């Protein structure tokens, strides 16, 4: 009888510890994601600051990192450009839980799209993912920095699990091989509500 009593006490204690751990995990999950802006060395520092400033208007938890070299393994010699998926893989290795890294470059970047082995793009972000990359190479001269910011915030959205959005003014609009950034103004309400479920704390 006494043995059963001790066994019951042990089970209760283990259950309490388990509940405590679950509560701790919930507290950790409630922390907002921190966006790390990672410029590559080809980037102008003023452009990096502009993009970071624009992101902060929407989402305040952000830090600019020191500029680094583009990873050598991402260079695609045949087309004189860089593979976006390789850049993302490189950045992801150095991105821990609770952080998302956005790489910024002026160089041309590409990825495989369907039957096209090397398709030039403005940016790439996997859904979900720890990192993404945006390039200014394919942007027009008018409002170039503003366009660059919109490409960056679009790719960050993908890392958080957002799909392309049918709302034409939303940052998550599908470019469809074009550059619709001048028509984009903000995340739509549906996309914002989704980001809130990912612990985004909007201003």
Please place each PLM-identified region on the residue numbering.
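Bacterial N-terminal signal peptides that target proteins for export
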Residues: 1-7
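C-terminal motif of bacterial Sec signal peptides marking the signal peptidase cleavage site
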Residues: 15-18
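Bacterial Sec signal peptide processing site at the extreme N-terminus
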Residues: 20-31
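Fold-level signature of zinc-dependent metallopeptidase catalytic domains
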Residues: 30-43
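Metzincin-family zinc-dependent endopeptidase catalytic domain
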Residues: 45-151, 163
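Metalloprotease/metallohydrolase-associated module, dominated by Zn2+-dependent proteases
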Residues: 119-147, 163-203
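Catalytic glutamate of the conserved HExxH
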Residues: 151-159
């Amino acid at each position: 009888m006494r043995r059963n009593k001790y066994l019951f006490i042990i089970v209760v204690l283990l259950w309490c510890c388990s509940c405590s751990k679950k509560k701790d995990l919930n507290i950790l999950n409630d922390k907002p994601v921190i966006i790390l802006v990672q410029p590559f060395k080809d980037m102008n520092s003023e452009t990096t600051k502009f993009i970071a400033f624009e992101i902060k208007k929407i989402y305040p938890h952000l830090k600019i990192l020191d500029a680094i070299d583009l990873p050598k393994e991402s260079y695609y010699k045949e087309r004189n450009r860089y593979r976006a998926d390789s850049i993302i893989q490189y950045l992801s290795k150095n991105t821990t839980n609770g952080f998302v890294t956005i790489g910024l470059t002026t160089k041309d970047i590409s990825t495989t799209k369907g039957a096209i082995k090397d398709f030039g793009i403005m940016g790439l972000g996997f859904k979900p993912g720890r990192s993404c990359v945006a390039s200014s190479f394919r942007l027009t001269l008018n409002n170039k920095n503003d366009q660059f910011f919109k490409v960056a915030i679009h790719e960050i959205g993908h890392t958080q699990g957002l799909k392309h959005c049918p709302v034409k003014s939303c940052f998550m609009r599908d470019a469809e091989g074009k550059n619709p950034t001048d028509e984009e103004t903000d995340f739509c309400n549906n996309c914002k509500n989704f980001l809130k479920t990912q612990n985004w704390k909007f201003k």
